[in-house]
């Protein structure tokens, strides 16, 4: 009892201060740097949710997905299709994005968790390619490569700054739920299977069932991000389910730092900034971006979150996990 | 001395397991009575671990039948067996290395209580209290907040043993629970295991290379050689058995 209190209650205040500080900083940038700043903040926030959804799988379930964009894309299309094909009012259609992504996660996840490690990863890739192909080629329904456009005013007509603020609130809710998942009995089960499936099994867990639950939760939140992205731009394209977004998510998680809850958040922040600013500075931006990523990984083997934690430790400001 | 008769808790009939051409278990028949502390001994490669894994449902492609409390458990998955009362440890200990000792034990209790789908902090706190209590019992309280990866091998084994107890199993399978421990640690752990088995009336099947520990703890001993059972008996009978002596003298150690 004592041990638990000493460990869990003390840093809670610091955690809340940290969150409040981060929100204040983002909101300040959002309000003080004009339209381009707001657009950037909104993108960062959406990517934070997307990367954090993958982080649940990778950092805690030790499941590497090479096809996470499938659920991002399904989120966009669930929302857009509900409006364009089923005449659902746009506000109500918001739930169909995460819902479709969750269902996609259930179907593909049930398939993928039958395999482990690299075979699991290859199956997730295959599932994502199937999703992409369907979105790309089913012209009558999904609009094919021209995607779905013009079905709503982007951002529901909100100003860039107000949309970014609204996205921030939603992102906070998502991250809080993910945090609760990680620190719940379910989270412990997900981590158990991730670290030693045979031990977990011998204790009485069905590894596949646990992994499927993690997969569906992860897909659902990727779907939230995808839905937000579709609202942000007022469209949905097959590329949202493509390799580009899959790769972005992977880079953000690894850059941010595996085995850390905030890995996806830090990764999304830094990677989105780099991706937006490096091309402005040099024509060889892909090379420069690659070198910067390489440097970060070399300097901080535990990613940005690990680096931040170490820095916080040096400043005597621990417990930033 | 008369053996106390009680129901058979585990029965294996005609167990056979092959790895390609290699026969790891060859037509093994085995009976285990409730309340026994049964040692499984034999030279390296005899098939002891293979047998344990067969019972725990962790091996594919096993021929023959395994009955647990009279029911065929051959088709059950390991996690189902765990909930029916079979707990085990592995020869090379398996724990959640990146988690703390307390988290490991809490995970074991959460899983045993089948409350892993819960999102409630209160559920976690309740299992954590049970876990902290078990850590006290197995003497790992001081280590509660250390990562298992930073623990010496002997303590990892002790932790794994505690985790196997979380489900309060009727049958405890321990595969070399004292490997890598000092002689003192070995006796300490196995005395504790024996006490606990006696106090709770559960059944123990354990693989052990230290013959002193076996003779001290076990109520029955089975000797395996080359995938088969050589002989089964009381510790005294086994110690006096010429064939067993030949097998052990013929071994390199
Ligand atoms: N996965 C496997 N593939 C091939 N052969 C295996 C496999 N597992 C075990 N064996 C072989 O089966 C035989 C029995 O192995 P087992 O681990 O059951 O022996 P053991 O009695 O536990 O020995 P030890 O005292 O060394 O632990 C050994 O010869 C081993 O090499
Ligand atoms: Mg063995």
Cite the ranges covered by each PLM segment.
Chain B
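Glycine-rich phosphate-binding loops of nucleotide-dependent enzymes
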Residues: 2-253
């Amino acid at each position: 009892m004592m041990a638990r209190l000493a460990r869990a209650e003390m840093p809670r205040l610091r955690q809340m201060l940290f969150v409040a500080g981060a929100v204040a900083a983002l909101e300040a940038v959002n309000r003080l740097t004009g339209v381009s700043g707001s657009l950037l903040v909104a993108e960062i926030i959406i990517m934070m949710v997307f990367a954090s959804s993958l982080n649940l799988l990778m950092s805690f379930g030790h499941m590497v997905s090479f096809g996470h964009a499938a659920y991002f894309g399904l989120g966009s299309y669930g929302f857009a299709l509900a409006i364009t094909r089923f005449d659902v009012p746009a506000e109500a259609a918001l739930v169909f994005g995460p819902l479709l992504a969750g269902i996609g996660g259930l179907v593909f996840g049930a398939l993928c968790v039958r395999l482990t490690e690299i075979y699991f990863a290859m199956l997730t890739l295959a599932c994502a390619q199937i999703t992409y192909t369907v979105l790309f080629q089913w012209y009558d329904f999904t609009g094919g490569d021209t995607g779905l456009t013009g079905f709503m005013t982007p951002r529901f007509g909100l100003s860039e700054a107000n949309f970014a603020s609204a996205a921030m609130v939603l992102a906070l809710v998502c991250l809080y739920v993910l945090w609760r998942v990680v620190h719940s009995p379910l989270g412990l089960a997900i981590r158990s299977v991730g670290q030693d499936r045979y031990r977990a099994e011998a204790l009485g867990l069905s590894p596949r069932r646990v992994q499927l639950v993690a997969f569906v939760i992860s897909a659902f939140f990727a779907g939230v991000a995808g839905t937000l992205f579709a609202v942000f731009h007022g469209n949905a394209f097959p590329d949202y389910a493509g390799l580009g977004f899959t790769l972005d998510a992977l880079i953000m998680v690894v850059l941010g730092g595996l085995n850390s809850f905030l890995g996806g958040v830090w990764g999304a922040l830094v990677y989105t900034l780099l991706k937006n600013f490096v091309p402005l500075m040099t024509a060889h931006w892909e090379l420069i971006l690659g070198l910067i990523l390489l440097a970060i990984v070399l300097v901080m083997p535990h990613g940005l979150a690990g680096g931040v934690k170490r820095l916080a430790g040096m400043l005597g400001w621990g417990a930033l996990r | 001395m008369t053996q106390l008769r009680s129901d058979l808790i585990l029965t294996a009939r005609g167990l056979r397991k092959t790895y390609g051409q290699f026969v790891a278990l060859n037509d093994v028949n085995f009976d285990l009575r409730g309340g026994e502390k049964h040692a499984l001994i034999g030279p390296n490669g005899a098939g002891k671990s293979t047998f344990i894994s067969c019972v725990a449902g962790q091996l594919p492609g096993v021929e023959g039948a395994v009955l647990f409390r009279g029911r065929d458990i051959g088709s059950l998955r390991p996690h189902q067996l765990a909930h029916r009362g079979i707990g085990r440890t592995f020869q090379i200990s398996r724990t959640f290395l990146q988690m703390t000792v307390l988290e490991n034990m809490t995970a074991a209790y959460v899983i045993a209580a089948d409350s892993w789908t819960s999102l409630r902090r209160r559920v976690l706190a309740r299992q954590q209290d049970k876990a902290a209590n078990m850590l006290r019992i197995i003497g790992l309280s001081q280590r509660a907040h250390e990562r298992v990866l930073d623990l010496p091998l002997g303590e990892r084994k002790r932790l794994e043993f505690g985790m196997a107890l979380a489900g309060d199993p009727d049958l405890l399978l321990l595969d070399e629970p004292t490997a890598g421990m000092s002689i003192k640690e070995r006796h300490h752990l196995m005395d504790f295991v024996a006490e606990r088995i006696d106090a709770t009336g559960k059944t123990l099947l354990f693989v052990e290379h230290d013959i002193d520990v076996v003779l001290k703890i076990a109520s029955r001993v089975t000797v395996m050689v080359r995938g088969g059972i050589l002989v089964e008996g009381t510790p005294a009978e086994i110690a006096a058995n010429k064939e067993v002596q030949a097998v052990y003298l013929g071994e390199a150690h």
